[in-house]
Amino acid sequence: MKKIISLLLLTLLFSGCVSNHNSSLENSEPETNLDTNSSVKTYRQITMKEAVDIMEQESNYIILDVRRPDEFSQGHIPNAINVPNENIDNTEISELPNKEQLILVYCRSGRRSKEASQKLVKLGYTNIVEFGGIIDWKGEIVS
């Protein structure tokens, strides 16, 4: 009988430790802010077609290619300017003086453009739109 009680106590103790461990793991997960009224600033992500629509309908925007200069020189979207993702840091970007300007951001595949968009938002830019990579671009490419 003592063995059964001892086993039950050990089982309860062990299960308490395990559930306590899991709750501390759950609490260590990063928080995701789902509040749409939050003051957290972010960028918009759109499809390639939506980007083309903006380019056809709007006139006051900048197309920002964040690839390396050698990639840019091999071919880019017409009228795009090149500011490599690696060059976007905590300093002002002379090519982008107006922080409220609509800026359409792309790279080769979409990874660097997302990263650059996040950096631009942190620098105070308020109208950043990321649309992926030139590998999906169906329009004209100039070099």
Question: Language-model segments: what does each one mean?
Answer:
Residues 66-71:
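Short, polar loop motifs at secondary-structure junctions
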Residues 2-7, 12, 17-54, 61, ...:
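Rhodanese-like catalytic fold shared by cysteine-dependent sulfurtransferases
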